[in-house]
Every structure is written in C-alpha cells, then in structure tokens.
Amino acid sequence: MNYLLFCLFFAFSVAAPVTVTRFVDASPTGYDWRADWVKGFPIDSSCNATQYNQLSTGLQEAQLLAEHARDHTLRFGSKSPFFRKYFGNETASAEVVGHFDNVVGADKSSILFLCDDLDDKCKNDGWAGYWRGSNHSDQTIICDLSFVTRRYLTQLCSSGYTVSKSKTNIFWAGDLLHRFWHLKSIGQLVIEHYADTYEEVLELAQENSTYAVRNSNSLIYYALDVYAYDVTIPGEGCNGDGTSYKKSDFSSFEDSDSGSDSGASSTASSSHQHTDSNPSATTDANSHCHTHADGEVHC
C-alpha cells in the first residue's frame, strides 16, 4: 500500500505544472524614459570608411578625455592642484563636472558630424573644420586637413608634446572638445573664449574664476593635463612647465585671496577677444573661424 502511494505521489509531482514569477520592467503605459537616448556623437554618411574610422575614434577619445576630467574632479574637487590651477582656489566644482558630463552623457540625437563641405569653406587656408552656424547649431563639418594632422590620445606626451607648450588641437580629443562646446546642445551657449594661451588661462583662473569655468581652453587644458598625469604617465604627466606634485597636494590646500573675482569681469571681456575671421558673417553659417590671442585661427 505504501509503495502504491509513493508511486502515485511521484507521478503527480512530475506532471504538476511549474509556476514561475516573472517581473516585467516595462511600465504598463509603455513609457521608457531612456528610449532614443543617444550618447555617442552621430556621424553622417558623407564620411567615407577611412574618414569614419578616424573620426569615430576621435569622438570616442574626446568623450574619454571628458569622462576622465569629470571623474578627476568628482574624486578630488577643489583639492586637486590641477583644478585650482585652471579654475581658482574658491571655485565650486559642480559646474566643471557638468560641462564634462554633458559631453559624456547628454542626448546627442540632434547632433551631426559631416565630411561634406556644405558651405564651401574647407578650401580656406588652415581650415580643419567648422561649426555651421546658428541656423545649423548642432552640425559640424570636418575638413580633410583634420584627417592628416590630428593625433590620438595614445600619443599624448610623445614626440615632444607638452601641455603647456603645445597647442590644444594637436589631438582629435582636444580639438573635438572645442567643437563640442560650440554646439548648442552641449555648450548650451555658456562656454565661450575668454582666454586662449596657457599663460592667459592660468591668469584668468586667478583673476576671474567665474569666467574660467566657462572658458573653452581652460576646460581643454585641464582635461589634457589631468589625463596626462593620471593615465598617460601616472604621477608625472607632461605639463612641461617644471611643476611637480606630491600625494599630499591632492588632500588639502590653503585658502587664498587670489581666487577672487573682484574687478576681473572687465579685464576678461576686454583682453580676450573672440572674433570671427569674417566680420560680415551672418547667422546662416558664414565664417565661424575665430582668431585667438596668439594669432592662431581656429576653424
């Protein structure tokens, strides 16, 4: 009898259906706030295969550079001697973090990088690319010159490059950061050109930290400097101005009055001009090159 009961129990247990509880992530309405969120920079089909390969790598490296600058700032804040050097001693780190985070994570579905010279400007001497203007505020043309002159982040600190003595646009990453901040959806009409050269950038940090955190080249020099120091040659970098840091330099600092903004607004606005090379430019994308204080024309 016991044997018969055992057989019946076994047969029932094998045949019994298994109930599985399944958790569904999607909301009942079908709404997904992450849908169509584009974090990478779109490239137009006008770029051929080799152009696409170079530009896509450059765009990825620019985001990598921005990501590290953001993370360095989150890790150390104003305790970082690099942060104080480029943005002053009395500056909150939140805005700097935000500018770099926009490059990393903001939606880029409206942005487009193209290789067709739609406005016939790549023929101009020295033009490696250009922003198309306010009527195409999220479009950037990359000219042929970029593809034969730009370097990659793996080459940082090589071939005589130093942060303080070399141009910021030698590398795809540095050049593209500059171009990103011209885009309305990334720069948000906040980031401008108040200081250009390394020396001017350091001066701006001490005279007007409010402008420094919104100065294109301050952000780019900072990103290159901390990447070189943290990643390329850890603990050493390749600044080139003879400055070295100890571990303790990242843990504390003495307050200084030199970070004050007092009386600096007029200096920054008058001494660091951002002008188009074509004064008759209109909003429908005439020349958007600009001449830096050292005479360099950036396109």
UniProtKB/Swiss-Prot annotation:
<feature type="glycosylation site" description="N-linked (GlcNAc...) asparagine">
    <location>
        <position position="135"/>
    </location>
</feature>
<feature type="glycosylation site" description="N-linked (GlcNAc...) asparagine">
    <location>
        <position position="48"/>
    </location>
</feature>
<keyword id="KW-0325">Glycoprotein</keyword>
<dbReference type="InterPro" id="IPR039124">
    <property type="entry name" value="PRA1-like"/>
</dbReference>
<dbReference type="GO" id="GO:0005178">
    <property type="term" value="F:integrin binding"/>
</dbReference>
<dbReference type="Pfam" id="PF13933">
    <property type="entry name" value="HRXXH"/>
</dbReference>
<keyword id="KW-0843">Virulence</keyword>
<dbReference type="GO" id="GO:0009277">
    <property type="term" value="C:fungal-type cell wall"/>
</dbReference>
<feature type="compositionally biased region" description="Low complexity">
    <location>
        <begin position="259"/>
        <end position="272"/>
    </location>
</feature>
<dbReference type="GO" id="GO:0052156">
    <property type="term" value="P:symbiont-mediated perturbation of host T-cell mediated immune response"/>
</dbReference>
<dbReference type="GO" id="GO:0001411">
    <property type="term" value="C:hyphal tip"/>
</dbReference>
<keyword id="KW-0732">Signal</keyword>
<feature type="signal peptide">
    <location>
        <begin position="1"/>
        <end position="15"/>
    </location>
</feature>
<dbReference type="GO" id="GO:0042784">
    <property type="term" value="P:symbiont-mediated suppression of host complement activation"/>
</dbReference>
<dbReference type="GO" id="GO:0009986">
    <property type="term" value="C:cell surface"/>
</dbReference>
<keyword id="KW-0964">Secreted</keyword>
<dbReference type="InterPro" id="IPR029482">
    <property type="entry name" value="HRXXH"/>
</dbReference>
<dbReference type="GO" id="GO:0141018">
    <property type="term" value="P:adhesion of symbiont to host via host extracellular matrix"/>
</dbReference>
<dbReference type="GO" id="GO:0044847">
    <property type="term" value="P:iron acquisition from host"/>
</dbReference>
<dbReference type="GO" id="GO:0008237">
    <property type="term" value="F:metallopeptidase activity"/>
</dbReference>
<dbReference type="GO" id="GO:0141203">
    <property type="term" value="P:symbiont-mediated suppression of host complement activation by activation of host proteases"/>
</dbReference>
<dbReference type="GO" id="GO:0042783">
    <property type="term" value="P:symbiont-mediated evasion of host immune response"/>
</dbReference>
<dbReference type="GO" id="GO:0030446">
    <property type="term" value="C:hyphal cell wall"/>
</dbReference>
<dbReference type="GO" id="GO:0141117">
    <property type="term" value="P:symbiont-mediated suppression of host complement activation by recruitment of complement control protein"/>
</dbReference>
<protein>
    <recommendedName>
        <fullName>pH-regulated antigen PRA1</fullName>
    </recommendedName>
</protein>
<dbReference type="GO" id="GO:0052085">
    <property type="term" value="P:symbiont-mediated suppression of host T-cell mediated immune response"/>
</dbReference>
<dbReference type="GO" id="GO:0045916">
    <property type="term" value="P:negative regulation of complement activation"/>
</dbReference>
<dbReference type="GO" id="GO:0007159">
    <property type="term" value="P:leukocyte cell-cell adhesion"/>
</dbReference>
<dbReference type="GO" id="GO:0070051">
    <property type="term" value="F:fibrinogen binding"/>
</dbReference>
<feature type="glycosylation site" description="N-linked (GlcNAc...) asparagine">
    <location>
        <position position="89"/>
    </location>
</feature>
<feature type="glycosylation site" description="N-linked (GlcNAc...) asparagine">
    <location>
        <position position="208"/>
    </location>
</feature>
<comment type="subunit">
    <text>Component of a multiprotein complex of 250 kDa composed of at least HYR1, MP65, and PRA1. Interacts with host Integrin alpha-M/beta-2 heterodimer. Also binds human factor H (CFH), CFHR1, plasminogen (PLG), complement C3, and C4BPA. Interacts with ZRT101.</text>
</comment>
<dbReference type="GO" id="GO:0044406">
    <property type="term" value="P:adhesion of symbiont to host"/>
</dbReference>
<feature type="compositionally biased region" description="Polar residues">
    <location>
        <begin position="278"/>
        <end position="288"/>
    </location>
</feature>
<comment type="function">
    <text>Cell surface protein involved in the host-parasite interaction during candidal infection. With MP65, represents a major component of the biofilm matrix. As a surface protein, binds the two human complement regulators CFH and CFHR1, as well as plasminogen PLG, mediates complement evasion and extra-cellular matrix interaction and/or degradation. As a released protein, enhances complement control in direct vicinity of the yeast and thus generates an additional protective layer which controls host complement attack, assisting the fungus in escaping host surveillance.</text>
</comment>
<feature type="region of interest" description="Disordered">
    <location>
        <begin position="253"/>
        <end position="299"/>
    </location>
</feature>
<dbReference type="InterPro" id="IPR024079">
    <property type="entry name" value="MetalloPept_cat_dom_sf"/>
</dbReference>
<dbReference type="GO" id="GO:0005576">
    <property type="term" value="C:extracellular region"/>
</dbReference>
<comment type="similarity">
    <text>Belongs to the ZPS1 family.</text>
</comment>
<dbReference type="GO" id="GO:0030985">
    <property type="term" value="F:high molecular weight kininogen binding"/>
</dbReference>
<dbReference type="GO" id="GO:0008270">
    <property type="term" value="F:zinc ion binding"/>
</dbReference>
